[in-house]
Every structure is written in structure tokens, then in C-alpha cells.
Amino acid sequence: MGDELALGVRAVSGAAVYRGMDRATLDRQYSPSSRVPSLDAYLRAYERLSAAARRDHPVRAGLAYGPHRAERLDYFPGPASGRCPLLVFVHGGNWQALGRAESAFPAPALLAEGAAVAVIEYGLAPDVGLDAMAGMVRRSVDWLLRHADRLGFAPHRLHLCGTSAGAHLAATTLLPDPADGPDVSGLIAGAVLLSGVYDLEPVRLSYVNDALRLDEAGARRNSPLHRLPARLPPVVVARGGNETEEYIRQHDRMVTALRPRTAITEVVADRRDHFDLPYDLGVRGTGLGDAVLARMGLGDARMGLGDARTGLGGTST
């Protein structure tokens, strides 16, 4: 009962599978769309805004960073050739949905502030396993760094950003000794983790694993919380105010684990949810936007580098 009360979840009569929750409750906790009126409305907005980004800004679309048909990225060049930072965006979708077509919407605000942007596509479950997905993200980073001069960004200013499942994959890319793909852990200037899952054991026990097919060992191997090294690059860890209790718990655990290892900026955007939080990337005057711009060394972002909570774009100590 104590775990359920701590989570703010109603006690249930079914067999408990994780922290006092039955399978149906756990499934709801790992279904972020349970907290919003319409997931489809967000997905349509992602697609519409991403199409506008490609229409209104120069882009090198469909660049192959690896041999798999899904290993493609779209590159939006920044204004300061050879010197600008790069934000690499890894989309969400529960490791089984979305792609480049819906994921360029953060680019315009970041481009306006002087960054280049790369939008990554990767293989999805059930066709591609989680180890291989993580390897693809690593290969994308490795490819971008090897082609930095040609693309026109500063390789020592590459920042990796992911949302939801993409936050998990971005966090995994920070870890040394990968199971798949090149080790790029020491080559990333900073990371931005939005509404992520960092311990996959509850995911393994939920409906999400119907596609992921993780066993206990695979869940642990792919859980960044269990493998964090002693030192990491600076990290912005953010979530919306309207997240499920389990997503909030995952966020809190990651923040606690990162504090002794790196400089961390925590952002809680009280009026944002799991799906609209990424809209604030690069947007001045929002907690997330200011934190990311400050970490990337762009402009005179108004928020200092520390913990933050605000209303629409959120932060506080």
C-alpha cells in the first residue's frame, strides 16, 4: 500500500507486478498519452511543424550514417560555418514509432539562436532490438563528428538531445563500453534528456515489452541508471509537470544519480506535458530553452545553470 500511496496510484486488486501495481496500472504509468486529451493532435502537429521546418530552412535530408535503411538523418546547417554548436535530436515514440518526418520541429528555434541541428532516424521495435537501436544512435554521432568539417559545425560542441525513448537512447550513448556501435562517450559536449526512462525493469514488465522483447538481463544492460560512469559531460534533465508518477520517479532517480557525476541542470516545466515539452527547445524565456542555450554557449540565456521550475517553460531550486 505504501508504494501505491507514494505514487499517487489507486490500490488495485490484481496481482502486483511492480512496486505494488498490477499490470493494468503499470501499463497506464508507462503510457504517457494517458495524461493528455489527444495524442493524435500532437502527432499531427509534429508532422506539420516538421514539414514547415524543412520548407523554410535549408536542409540536407536523408543522409546515410550507417548501412541499415533506417540509419538516416536530416542536417540543418547553422549560420556560423565551422564554429557553431550542433544539437543532435533523437525522437521518442516508445522505441516503436515516429521518425525524421515528425521530428524536425525543434530546428527553427535552435537555428535562429545560431546552432546547427541534426534529426536522427533509427530502427524501431519489433524489427530492431534495443541494443541495435542504441548502436545506431552512437553511429549517427560518430558519423557526424567525422564529417563535421564538411557539414560546418564545431565537433567539440556536439550536444545530444533525446525525448522520451530518445532520452533513454541519448543517455545510453553517454555510457562507455557499448554492446553495439562505436564508443562515443567521451566525444559529446553535453546532453539534454527530456521525459526519459532510465531503468527499464518496469518497462520490461509492461505492455511496451510486447514489442521490445527484453529479458531481465537485456533490461538491465540497457538501463543507464545501472551503468553510469564516474564522470559525464554536463546534462540538462527535464520533464513536464503533467507526467505520470512513474515518469516523474524515473526523472527524479536520474537527477539524483547524475548529481555526483557531472554539472546538472534540472528543469520542471509545470505547464508542459510529455509531448509538448520539446516545443521549448531553443526558445528563450522558457526554462528548458534557456538551459539548453546556456549549455550550448549561445547568446545571453537569461536563466543561470542550476535547478529550475517555471510555469510554461519551467524551473526552481
Q: Where are the predicted features?
A:
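N-terminal cap/lid segment of alpha/beta-hydrolase-fold proteins
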Residues: 29-81
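Short beta-strand element of the alpha/beta-hydrolase
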Residues: 83-93
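Hydrophobic beta-strand anchors of alpha/beta hydrolase catalytic cores
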Residues: 87-89, 117, 235
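Alpha/beta-hydrolase
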Residues: 90, 194, 269-272
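Short amphipathic alpha-helix adjacent to the substrate-entry channel of hydrolases
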Residues: 101-119
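Primarily recognizes the serine-hydrolase "nucleophile elbow" in alpha/beta-hydrolase
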Residues: 139-207
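The feature captures the conserved acid-bearing segment of alpha/beta-hydrolase catalytic domains
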Residues: 184-185, 190, 196-204, 216-252
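C-terminal catalytic histidine-bearing segment of alpha/beta-hydrolase fold enzymes
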Residues: 248, 252, 259-300, 311-317
